[in-house]
């Protein structure tokens, strides 16, 4: 599948699936499984960062470390912004209250596009990102 087809499938809501070891609820399809680093905001500062396996699905992003498994549904992420091609900042709600996290992963652009498609299709970064992804077949989203 080339980049243009992938972008169109994201717009249509029909995503390609990849094999994953994560047990997914019915109706959820894994799109990517990549390594990454997540930083959580606690109070006034950010933690040291934790290496995680990042699974992006049609409904959420799942972060799995050695000590925990966290699923963030698109409905729980209220705001997102790509800071770099591979760095995504998210703000949302967890079972313990409001939180923020930064996620560095090859799948940051895909994760952002899926979140935006579900929560904020008019996000100001979407048009330029889709245009750049369509023009650059070497983009991580096209792999």
Where are these regions (language model features)?
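Generic, low-specificity signal for short hydrophobic/alpha-helical stretches with a mild N-terminal bias
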Residues: 14, 43, 59, 138-140
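Acidic, Ser/Thr- and proline-rich intrinsically disordered linker/docking segments
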Residues: 49, 66-143
